[in-house]
Amino acid sequence: ITLNRPEKRNALSPGMLVTVYEAWRQLDNDDNLRCAILTGAGGTFCSGADLTAMKGGNEDSEMMKKLEEIPDLHWQALLRHNRPCKPVIAAVEGFALAGGTEILQGTDIRVAGKSSTFGLTEPQRGLFPLGGSTIRLRRQIPYTLAAEMLLTGRRVSAEEALDYGLIGHIVEDGHALEKAKEIAERIC
């Protein structure tokens, strides 16, 4: 599953949320799929929500209809109200900020390029991280670091994320997907 809006640093639009939601449904329903790899195009994992696109008016009407039909679709896409029954591996390059860090927390195995950066930048904009981080992050890393990230928008490097257990592997930049595929081969 590739988040593919590199010109927007893979910021999540309503259309992308629908597409990711549908990918999770396919993963669960297709017996030929044994696991998934979530990555981003163009050297960035995901920079969060595209706040301009979220205002509406720019998306395909069929996608907007689906968002209206399934009220928590965006939470399911971000793996907040959804837990795929098969393993999900994250292959992170570059930024995993805001919604990028939130969806990351719903994955099972996490690989990152050595210059990747993680963080919940919502507090810096006067926003609240609604994708589940207030619960999941403090369960996955030490409470004091989770609190600092949640309250201040502090960013952490790949090295620090590895030290605290937010990710499991660091590789040379440009090789996260390759490592994720190696892990997927062992699973499948």
Task: Give the ranges of each region predicted by the language model.
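Conserved CoA-thioester-binding segment of acyl-CoA-metabolizing enzymes
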Residues: 1-41, 55-57
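C-terminal long alpha-helix characteristic of the crotonase
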Residues: 6, 111-116, 167-188
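An acidic, glycine-rich surface segment that forms the CoA-thioester-binding/catalytic face
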Residues: 17-21, 25-29, 51-93, 135, ...
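Short helix- or helix-capping micro-motifs
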Residues: 47-49, 92, 137, 145-154
